[in-house]
Amino acid sequence: MNKLKPVLYLLFSILILSCQPTVDNKKQPVAASAPEEIIVDCNYTFAEAIEGTKAPRSVTEQLELIDVEYYSMDGKIHRGQILTNKKLVADIKTAFEFILKEKFPVEQVIPVVKYNWNDELSMQANNTYSFCYRNVSYSRHAYGMAIDINPFLNPLRWKKEYSYRKDQPANATYNPEIPGTFSPNHPVVLKFKELGFRWGRNFKRNHDDHHFEK
């Protein structure tokens, strides 16, 4: 019996150890967070984006349709499109990368073809755009060399000596406290100036706060 005790003790020890829970020292994989859903505001082809314009081919050949992403007024990332001059493509992309990083809210970015090339309707919708073939004698928009951002929040306001003219868009009021509006030292304004754009706030006859041009 005494000879069996060590054997029984060994078997008992093995049984006890086998019942102990095993510890897995391997790190459990961390589930990757799902990317934020992007809301698509428009998805035109180039042909669709210039459909119905009165611009001659010599002008439309200078244009390019690009995608941009931005936070809209709902706090979500949206994707829109800008029809602009090829000379501005790199700068517009850089500006919108900055706008996205700053989380500066942009209502929507849709080519004006959606509004049948009616600039007033586009502005009433607070729509951001570049090319619109109008006022060809002086408007940089006629060649896609300008961009208007949140025009309803940043309306064109005539200076006192020209107050007999109507501000645009109609019924819009400038309030710099509202998100999406510009002021002289606003980071987005400074970024556009850094990129070589002229800001409409400094025009001789009016304060065209939504307008940046080259």
Q: Across the structure, where does each feature detected by a protein language model lie?
A:
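Active-site acidic/histidine clusters and adjacent loop/turn architecture
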Residues: 58-122
